[in-house]
Curated annotation (Swiss-Prot):
It comes from Cyanophora paradoxa. The lineage of its organism: Eukaryota, Glaucocystophyceae, Cyanophoraceae, Cyanophora. It is found in: Plastid, Cyanelle. It comes from the Eukaryota. Its EC number is 2.7.7.6. The gene is rpoB. Transmembrane segments: none annotated. DNA-dependent RNA polymerase catalyzes the transcription of DNA into RNA using the four ribonucleoside triphosphates as substrates. Keywords: Cyanelle, DNA-directed RNA polymerase, Nucleotidyltransferase, Plastid, Transcription, Transferase. This is DNA-directed RNA polymerase subunit beta.
Length: 1103
């Protein structure tokens, strides 16, 4: 019997990277950063401030997570630190417990709640601190080497060899200095320097060229190079040298930098020494000189051994460091004003140490950093993938414009660490990636991937999983997981393809060192959910991976007939399903509540999430999947989410699909669907929109929420309660009032009779205007929730809401059925737009009368090379008839040639025999069936491929995109209609569209589009009047954009004027009355008229 390598589920939580990093921040990162900061000494040396961080305290957030979300607040804990202030002259000590800022807390779903919005901190992958040797080749083919020492904090140091074999040293890529001057400035004698080198004669050339010098001369030269404007001085030179490379507060190699330096140069320096030592510098130089003699290796900067991941904890630590630097300056300023006398009087230290700089830094990071993103909550998979994302962008990383192809490319060291498939399609291709399923971060932030040890062809599973980093892996011969093994865990076969030193080679099985633990470990989570992935082209697999994240959760979730086995873990690790905490018996189950009685008799109550709005307006709700009296285990799923089915990820529906053309309706990836999908709510989804209004104190008085709205009939107020707020459960259409609100109107200049009436009858109430919140046009739905916050009742509201007295939030749920224009896709990148919904009687049908659900174009398969959809479709067809579901791990060719095809044929034959439906499988046309036209009842000429495909409805819904405009707002400068649905904009008639009308010869249509339908202000008003009065539309005038062009040319000091030719005499010209400035005639116009009268007719005018 043969079996595969162990393909059990991933051995750890998929969100471990986020959780572990945040935990590290509180246990180590925070303490380390403030210990480096403490003590702060007054510049006069009189006072000293100590921070005792090991005794820090975190106070629980004021509000629960749910309350903070409703009030648009940040879910954060308050940090308090014991502080000690010492007077160094008198020895008096004062202690206090100081508030040190609010630190946002990670929720159990690994997100942060910032101002009521869930956000995710994504992981940044950056060049690791350490040492990098590189080679440069000039046009003549001369090779020169250089070395860069990258620190975690502080200046970059570089040594380079020029084509004359002289060694130079650079600081921060600018200041250049002969290398031996730098060494002499470090107080090293010539004998010490030369004895440390393997080839001392190479450096002697540099010393001979520039001349020897003493330590003092070297320091003077060092100062001259770094501060060219100042008089050179050896004392200042020594201070500059110390502060640049040997002051722990200014220069820090970091834990990782020291590790990389020790590893590359075989040093044994303590990990706690994080500054450069003279031993480091001599070894760095020795290695550089050895490269000139062909000894040693240069470094590949794109290798993952030289790139590390900064997860959330480290990013927070960097941000805290910026805040502490600002705080230090503040403390110095406050200490400079402190005297011994005022110190004795001071009871509290709170005025001395203000948490504002730290708070501002953290707010800035969480609110506006490139690495803090609005969480993608479209479905559970999108949420999970967002937290496992890696980016090269962000502070300290690269920018989109500077990133070349080398950075974006797939590197051999990415194997098992960064997914080669999942990346965005646009500008960010290759810059944003995703961690693979089994990837894991080590203590230094390098990505590791798991393997089993192999001894003499036997897999040593009993030794457990061994994690290797990219540079460790290069030393071994590593086999992929898709090899066959027998029951004794011995690899079958003689010659096996392995990876060795970033190349693929063939080797004997007894020479294999390690084997991958799963074929899925090369890919990210969403790519691992694609069945038959090995049969898809990578470009289409990329689209399939990305589109699964855009799938809208449906009303009735259905798990796929054909999956990969990862669906359960993705659903569980996304934290969107409800997981049982303790073994016991289900005591009570309702729609929103589950009660479990544990074996000890204790009751655990779980409250389900019901109809909550996600960041993308999709619906988050939980459904119980256990029943009363059922025995449940710890870790068992108790309730499903909107996009899970029995605890498995369920993003779409299994549909009966036929690959055939149908009357041209599925041309260019269009899709035909059966009306059954509409009537039976197969693809119906729920979307929840939020609308908000607030009452404010204006100059003219306070706004008021009321039912008494001027000039509004009773029918428009039908859904409002006595307060003027819409009732929960009401059905609302576009234009309906959600919240009745009035604002005071300014008193207009009253006519004399008005003043007389006022004088007789006294002060009358001022007019109010209608400022009600209304439903936008084209929208409809049912009110599911109304929330009111009133300041008088002490409701804490979000920052910035200080001027609001009342805030009303309305949540409206919409049921969106599938319709023409919606986008659908499979898991293999096969996407399309619905072009027609056919009556079920018109759909092609099977020999047993079953109508097809969806018709796809067969031409979408061959050129796209995503044949996986064909395999999935046929295996799903077999699964349907056998009453089973299949879980397949990709790369099954290890079982033999054409393994997928053979397996599917076997299953189809089995289904045929089990159901006695002989038409299910025909060996002459395997996978194809004779279909009949629903309109005529006749069979089609050729057999057609029919099967069960798993299709998703994507978030690009036509309801959100379709838009029409009759009249609307115009741009202030160009006077053209605005663009976009949100601005009630028009359709852009661009350059190419103009060409199309020109080619067609539609002159009048084109003129109307460019003038009265766009920016001819006078013309469009006249046209509207003419349409209203039923008269002929007048001829268009001059578009505003022409006037803008004229003004721009005049701004360049070009006296450009437009003329029109009169209808009478062709030779006579007069200035065209274009009012550019608001006045009819300008001085320049009068001058031109005089010139025209004086000059001879037909003579060319020059201005």
């Amino acid at each position: 019997m043969t079996q595969l390598t162990d393909t059990s589920l991933i051995p750890f939580d998929l969100l471990e990277i986020q959780k572990a990093s945040f935990k590290w921040f509180f246990e180590e990162g925070l303490i380390e950063e403030i210990e480096n900061f403490s003590p702060v000494i007054d510049l006069r040396g009189n006072f000293e401030v100590h921070f005792y961080l090991k005794n820090y305290e975190l106070e629980a957030p004021t509000f629960t997570l749910e309350e903070a979300k409703q009030r648009d607040l940040t879910y954060a804990a308050q940090l308090y630190i014991p502080v000690e202030l010492r007077d160094l002259e008198t020895g008096i000590v004062k202690q206090d417990r100081i508030f040190f800022g609010e630190i946002p807390l990670m929720t159990d779903r690994c997100t942060f709640l910032i101002n009521g919005v869930e956000r995710v901190i994504i992981n940044q992958i950056i060049r690791s601190p350490g040492i990098y040797y590189s080679v440069n080749t000039d046009e003549q083919g001369t090779r020169t080497y250089d070395v860069t020492i990258i620190s975690n904090r502080g200046a970059w140091l570089k040594f380079e060899v020029d084509k004359d074999d002289l060694i130079w040293m650079r600081i921060d890529k600018t200041h250049r200095l002969p290398c031996h001057i730098f060494l002499k400035a470090l107080n090293l004698s010539e004998s010490e320097i030369l004895s440390a080198l393997t080839h001392p004669e190479f450096l002697q050339k540099t010393i001979y060229e520039h001349g020897d010098c003493t330590e003092e001369e070297a320091l003077i030269e060092f100062h001259r190079q770094l501060r060219p404007g100042e008089p050179p001085n050896s004392i200042q030179g020594r201070y500059l040298l110390y502060s640049r490379f040997f002051d722990p507060k200014r220069y820090d190699l970091g834990f990782v930098g020291r590790y990389k330096l020790n590893k590359k140069l075989n040093l044994n320096v303590s990990p706690n020494i994080r500054i450069l030592t003279t031993q480091d510098i001599l070894e760095i130089l020795n290695y550089l000189i050895n490269l000139q003699f062909g000894m040693g290796q240069i470094d590949d900067i794109d290798h993952l051994g030289n790139r590390r991941v900064k997860a959330v904890g480290e990013l927070l630590q960097s941000q805290l460091r910026i805040g502490l630097n600002r705080l230090e300056r503040l403390i110095h300023d406050r200490l400079s004003m402190l005297t011994t006398k005022s110190f004795k009087k001071r009871k509290k230290l709170t005025t001395l140490i203000n948490a504002k700089p730290i708070n501002e830094c953290l707010k800035e990071f969480f609110g506006s950093s490139q690495l803090s993103q609005f969480m993608d909550q479209t479905n559970p998979l999108a949420e999970l993938i967002h937290k496992r994302r890696l980016t090269i962008l962000g502070p300290g990383g690269l920018s989109r414009d500077r990133a070349g192809c080398a950075v974006r490319d797939i590197h051999p060291s990415h194997y098992g660490r960064i997914c080669p498939i999942e990346t965005p399609e646009g500008q960010n291709a290759g810059l944003v990636g995703s961690l693979t399923t089994h990837a894991h971060l080590n203590q230094y932030g390098f990505i590791e991937t798991p393997f089993y040890k192999v001894e003499k062809g036997y897999i040593q599973k009993e030794l457990g999983i061994i994690y290797l980093t990219a540079d460790e892996e290069d030393q071994y011969r590593i086999a992929a997981a898709d090899v066959l093994i027998n029951e004794t865990n011995k690899i079958i076969g003689e010659d096996i393809s392995v990876r060795y030193r970033q190349e693929f080679i063939t080797t004997k099985i007894d020479q294999i060192d390690f084997i991958a633990i799963s074929p899925l470990q090369t890919f990210s989570v969403s790519t691992s959910l694609i069945p038959f992935l090995e049969h898809d082209d990578a470009n289409r697999a990329l689209m399939g991976s990305n589109m699964q994240r855009q799938a809208v959760p449906l009303l009735h979730a259905e798990k796929p007939l054909v999956g990969t086995g990862l669906e359960f873990q993705v659903a569980k690790d996304s934290r969107r399903v409800l997981i049982n905490k303790s073994e016991g018996l289900v005591k009570r189950v309702t729609g929103d509540h589950i009660c479990i009685q544990t074996d000890t008799g204790k009751e655990i109550n779980y409250t389900l999430i019901k109809y909550q709005r996600s960041n993308q307006d999709t619906c988050i709700t939980q459904r119980p999947i256990v029943f009363e009296g059922e025995r449940v285990k710890k870790g068992q799923i108790l309730a499903d989410d909107t996009a899970t089915d029995k605890g498995e990820l369920a993003l779409g529906q299994n549909l009966l699909v036929a690959y055939m053309p149908w009357e041209g309706y599925n041309y260019e990836d269009a899709i035909l669907i059966n009306e059954r999908l509409v009537y039976e709510d197969v693809y119906t989804s729920i979307h929840i929109e939020k609308y908000e209004t607030e009452t404010r104190q204006t100059k003219l008085g306070i706004e008021e929420i009321t039912r008494e709205i001027p000039n509004v009939n009773e029918y428009s107020l039908r859904n409002l309660d006595e307060k003027g707020i819409v009732s929960v459960g009401s059905w609302i259409k576009g234009g309906d009032i959600l919240v009745g609100k009035v604002a005071p109107k300014a008193e207009s200049d009253q006519p004399p009779e008005g003043k007389l009436l006022k004088a007789i009858f006294g002060e009358k109430n001022r007019d109010v205007r209608d400022t009600s919140l209304r439903m936008p046009s084209g929208e409809k739905g049912r009110i599911v929730d109304v929330r009111i916050f009133i300041r008088e009742f002490g409701e804490m509201l979000y920052p910035g809401a200080n001027t609001a007295n009342t805030i009303v939030r309305i949540y409206i749920a919409q049921k969106r059925k599938i319709q023409v224009g919606d986008k659908m896709a499979g898991r293999h990148g096969n996407k399309g737009i619905i072009s027609k919904i056919l009556p079920r009687q018109d759909m092609p049908y099977l020999p047993d009368g079953t109508p097809i659900d969806i018709i796809l174009n067969p031409l979408g398969v061959p050129s796209r090379m995503n044949v996986g959809q064909v395999y999935e479709c046929l295996l799903g067809w077999a699964a349907e008839h056998l009453g089973v579901r299949f879980k397949l791990i990709p790369f099954d060719e290890r079982f033999g040639k054409q393994a997928s095809r053979t397996f599917i044929h076997e299953k189809l034959k089995e289904a045929k025999e089990l159901t006695n439906k002989n038409w299910l499988f025909n060996s002459n046309h395997p996978g194809k069936i004779q279909l009949f036209d629903g309109r005529t009842g006749e069979s089609f000429d050729n057999p057609i491929m029919v099967g069960k495909a798993y299709m998703l409805k994507l978030v690009h819904l036509v309801d959100d995109k379709i838009h029409a405009r009759s009249t609307g707002p115009y741009s202030l400068i160009t006077q053209q209609p605005l663009g976009g649905k949100a601005q009630q904009g028009g359709q852009r008639f661009g350059e190419m569209e103009v060409w199309a009308l020109e080619a067609f010869g539609a002159a009048y249509t084109l003129q109307e589009i460019l003038t009265i339908k766009s920016d001819d202000m006078l013309g469009r008003n006249e046209a509207l009047k003419a349409i209203v009065k039923g008269k002929a539309i007048p001829r268009p005038g001059i578009p505003e954009s022409f006037k803008v062009l004229m003004r721009e040319l005049q701004a360049l000091c070009l006296d450009v004027v437009a003329y029109k030719i009169q209808n009478g005499d062709q030779d006579e010209c007069e200035a065209l009355a274009i009012d550019l400035s608001g006045s009819l005639a300008t001085p320049i116009d009068n001058i031109i008229k005089e010139v025209i009268q004086q000059e001879e007719l037909g003579e060319e005018l020059t201005s």
